Amino acid sequence: MLSIRRFFNNPAIPPEYRRNFIHLYFDIAWFGILSGSAINFLTVYAARLGASGFQIGLLSAMPAVVSLFLSIPAGNWLQKQPVDKAVFWTAVLSRLGYFLWIPLPWLFGNQGQIWALAIITLVMGIPMCALSVGFNALFAASVPIEWRASVVGIRNVVQSLTFIISSLGTGYILNHLRFPTGYQVIFGIGFLSAAMSTFHLFFVRPNLEPVKTISHEMITDQNSSSKFNKVRFNWRGKLRLDIWGTSYRKVMLVFLGFHTAQYLALPVFTIYTVNILHLTDANIGTGTALFYLTVLLGSTQFSRIEHHVGHHKLTGWGVISMSIYPIAMALSHNAIHYYLLSIAGGFAWALVAGAYANYLLERIPEDDRPSHLAWYNIILNAAVLFGSLAGPFLAGYLGLSLGLIIFGALRLLAGVAILKWG
């Protein structure tokens, strides 16, 4: 018990940082329960309602549609707000949507529920856009760079543990309660977990003073008195197109390739496991638990590997390793195969999940994080939107197995691109 306490409350951590770290660990613990229950089984629920590949992809694409339009305004808004308060209130607003999933079986038929879920996720995406940009900025401001690898590693361990427990528990509940009552219970557990995660985010405070800089909107061209030129400059300043003139451009482009390859396959996984492999909810819960068990084991070694390899190379090789999962799924025929590929996929994701956020933060100026993260958020959500809608379409045209193999090859190429040009 003492060793566990020391793992999460390392006495070497300076007192001014310890409180933030503990709340970040509890935040991700509750988020792991949310992810392993409501979020993990949302598309499975939609598939069991009879959702098409397009509708399953749409559930992932809806928040991306919002983020494409709101990421830059969200980044500009966050520049003017206390980042801790902005993260808390956007978390509150976005996570209220999980509660609305619970009564849907009482209100609509199967198709009505599918479209209602799509609309709710669309509305949730509005505050979630600012939350996704703001949390990365809050993490960077509350965790010093020398502690980030350690904190990320522990957060991955905690998330893996809670995800494993909630995935197994969710599969058990769904196998013992009638449809759709079991899913309503799971959505209720997800909402409670989201509320507790948000509660702990409230206590995370920035410790690092941001560097004071002149706002891009305040700078004017003193060699020109043209009002048109000033307006045009302010317009470009608001969009922060200047970021595309920096070395960060290469990072955004390689991540566009990675996330596109990643999200092309994700909706197809649900279709393949439910309609081709005919897995039960317990099978799916066990598979995801095995996936995160290997994420957990990989995370315990993350700090040591990162110290020798670095975030950049670790991200690239992790993405290359992620190509195994879709290719192996295309060759699977039963639950045992699904369990084995889940184990392999978990090790690959442990590398990427631990490294890529820190890799991004290393490439971003400390005094301009929100705007750079907003552009990354646009890249991410463009990939989510395209991949989530194009993946089921291409897999339906090519065949699910061939589509998964091609998507795996694209992941491999994306990893090579990160290593070579990132």
Predicted regions and their residues:
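Helix-loop boundary and gating motifs at the non-cytosolic
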Residues: 2-69, 88, 94, 99-102, ...
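Juxtamembrane intracellular "pre-TM" segments in multi-pass secondary transporters
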Residues: 2-18, 208-253
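Structural signature of the two symmetry-related core transmembrane helices
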Residues: 86-101, 191, 313-328, 405-408
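Loop-to-transmembrane helix entry/capping segments in MFS-fold secondary transporters
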Residues: 53-54, 145-155, 281-282, 366-376
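Intracellular juxtamembrane helix-capping segments at the cytosolic ends
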Residues: 128-143, 351-364
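Helix-loop junctions on the cytosolic side of multi-pass membrane transporters
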Residues: 198-217, 419-422
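Helix-to-loop junctions at the C-terminal end of transmembrane segments
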Residues: 69-85, 174-175, 298-311, 395-396
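Transmembrane alpha-helix termini and helix-breaking/packing motifs in multi-pass membrane transporters
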Residues: 44-48, 102-108, 163-187, 386-404
